[in-house]
């Protein structure tokens, strides 16, 4: 039961790190990146549909993104969704593809994005700490119920602390890389 609890905690912590990676990739850096549009929803035939399901992406230049819809009738809907998104993109529709040129980021905007990324990083760490707390409660209950000995419980707790530390360090490393990417001019 202890191993199952630790394995479950590790899987949840891995998921928290993955979510942080996705959140970080959604913060723009001045370069074109299809991940920026991961959460853009298009009103396609009356149903909100993720942009990735409607089009393919190409990055021909550092600040240009080409979006090629699988169905050309969706061009207008995609362009409208991009214009209304929080990405700050300026789409231009040439009838076949949508070209998005990412504007240069000002230093002030870069600092705002760094704050946003730090907030997302802290959210991920809080999530990891909550996972640790719940796993520790489960471990304590297992020991209290007599399903495992005190020694096993303390060994598992140390392993849980190691997992927490490793995953928190992963978040810190992701944050450091994203900050460097954002502040690079």
Swiss-Prot record:
Function as written in the Swiss-Prot or TrEMBL entry: Responsible for the release of ribosomes from messenger RNA at the termination of protein biosynthesis. May increase the efficiency of translation by recycling ribosomes from one round of translation to another.
SUPFAM superfamilies: Ribosome recycling factor, RRF
Primary gene name: frr
The protein's name in its UniProt record: Ribosome-recycling factor
Main localization of the protein described in the UniProt heading: cytoplasm
Gene Ontology molecular function, alphabetical: ribosomal large subunit binding
Organism: Renibacterium salmoninarum (strain ATCC 33209 / DSM 20767 / JCM 11484 / NBRC 15589 / NCIMB 2235)
Region (Disordered): 142-165
Entries under Gene3D superfamilies matching the protein: 3.30.1360.40, Ribosome-recycling factor
Keyword terms of this UniProt record: Cytoplasm, Protein biosynthesis
Family: Belongs to the RRF family.
Compartments where found: Cytoplasm
A GO cellular-component term linked to this record: cytoplasm
UniProt xrefs under Pfam families: RRF
Gene Ontology biological process terms in this record: translational termination
């Amino acid at each position: 039961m202890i191993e199952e609890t630790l394995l479950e905690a590790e899987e949840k912590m891995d998921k928290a790190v993955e979510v942080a990676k996705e959140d970080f990739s959604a913060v723009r850096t001045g370069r074109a990146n299809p991940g920026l549009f991961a959460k853009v929803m298009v009103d396609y035939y009356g149903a909100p549909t993720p942009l990735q399901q409607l089009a393919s992406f190409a990055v021909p230049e550092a600040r240009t993104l080409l979006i090629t819809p699988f169905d050309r009738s969706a061009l207008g809907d995609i362009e409208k969704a991009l214009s209304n998104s929080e990405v700050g993109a300026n789409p231009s529709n040439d009838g076949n593809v949508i070209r998005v040129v990412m504007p240069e980021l000002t230093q002030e905007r870069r600092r705002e994005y760094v704050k946003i990324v730090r907030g997302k990083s802290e959210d991920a760490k809080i999530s990891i700490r909550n996972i640790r707390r719940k796993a520790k409660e489960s471990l304590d209950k297992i020991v209290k119920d007599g399903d495992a000995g005190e020694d096993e419980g303390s060994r598992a707790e140390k392993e849980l602390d190691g997992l927490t530390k490793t995953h928190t360090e992963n978040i810190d490393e992701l944050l450091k890389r994203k900050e460097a990417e954002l502040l690079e001019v």
